[in-house]
Amino acid sequence: MKERYPTKKIYVGDVAVGGDAPISVQSMTYSDTRDVAATVEQINRLHFAGADMVRVAVPEMEDALALKAIKEQISLPLIADIHFNYRLALEAAKWVDCIRFNPGNIGEKSRIKEIVKACQERNLPIRVGVNAGSLEKEFDQKYGATAEGMVASAEYNIKFLEDLGFTDIKVSLKASDVDRTVDAYRMLRPKNAYPFHLGVTEAGTIFHATVKSAIGLGALLLDGIGDTMRVSITGELEEEIKVGKAILKDSGRVQEGLNIISCPTCGRIEADLVSAVAEVEKRTAHIKTPMDVSVMGCVVNAIGEAKHADVAIAYGKGSGLVMVKGEVVAKLPEGELVERFVAEVEKFAGENG
């Protein structure tokens, strides 16, 4: 795994993005933003799920005017998502912690100047959010909806902001497929030091979005690219955070929580392994201490994996072993193994957290 690219550190509210800051995970509400109660409820759900910041759509002035009441009731940093109407950004900037605008549909550059001025006055960062499906006409005509087109748009708009004396910038380059998304980020990364917001847009249902995001975001993270990220899922908000954090952990960018090793099901399994692993996941989700644990369903690989795990279950016929650091600490009936295993995990976390 490569070292992370060194990037400029900016702040979205009190959350650092870039530099040596941890890679943050964010999501976006799907409520009508003007419905303050519904939007606050969704933001609080995301906060509870572990989101570091949240973005809301601002399609109309009524939504922009609701941001004050929303901001007063939440503690997560709030990002306003702006398309088409720059005046919405001017109102939103009074209340939020960051403005995202789409350069492909915001219109004349004089409008971007007004957005920059509003953000400068309030020390707000701006995300230049380039989408392959809505490039500016000149870049679309020259490059089409390609990675090259996204990079050209981003470079042009970054320079435009820099020429105005504005450098609290983060950048995103999103397409609905992995290939263009990854190519665009890889092309742009060596050309500037601004933090990158990673994401594959319009990724689909939880199954397809998880696969696309794991491949695309995982590849970029392994390359050392990325400072904040969103997994876009057509589904429940909490799933975006859950998948995003799992990608960060399994790419090695975050050392937190359990790495659960469990065998694929086969004819040798001598226990209800699927239920056991599901229960282990549920009952240990709160643990932040990094550790490797294994839950194995037969003797073929169980002992070998247990030797390398911090805590392990090795199932046999009707009973099994609980092991800590390769040493057997209990031989128990099958129905008692998970309970003892969880107790040993919590003990290990307490001693090593």
Swiss-Prot record:
InterPro entries: Dihydropteroate_synth-like_sf (IPR011005), IspG_bac (IPR016425), IspG_bac-typ (IPR004588), NO2/SO3_Rdtase_4Fe4S_sf (IPR045854). GO terms for molecular function: 4 iron, 4 sulfur cluster binding; 4-hydroxy-3-methylbut-2-en-1-yl diphosphate synthase activity (ferredoxin); 4-hydroxy-3-methylbut-2-enyl-diphosphate synthase activity (flavodoxin); iron ion binding. Binds 1 [4Fe-4S] cluster. [4Fe-4S] cluster binds at C263, C266, C298, E305. Pathway: Isoprenoid biosynthesis; isopentenyl diphosphate biosynthesis via DXP pathway; isopentenyl diphosphate from 1-deoxy-D-xylulose 5-phosphate: step 5/6. Converts 2C-methyl-D-erythritol 2,4-cyclodiphosphate (ME-2,4cPP) into 1-hydroxy-2-methyl-2-(E)-butenyl 4-diphosphate. PANTHER family: 4-HYDROXY-3-METHYLBUT-2-EN-1-YL DIPHOSPHATE SYNTHASE (PTHR30454), 4-HYDROXY-3-METHYLBUT-2-EN-1-YL DIPHOSPHATE SYNTHASE (FERREDOXIN), CHLOROPLASTIC (PTHR30454:SF0). This is 4-hydroxy-3-methylbut-2-en-1-yl diphosphate synthase (flavodoxin). It comes from Sulfurovum sp. (strain NBC37-1). The gene is ispG.
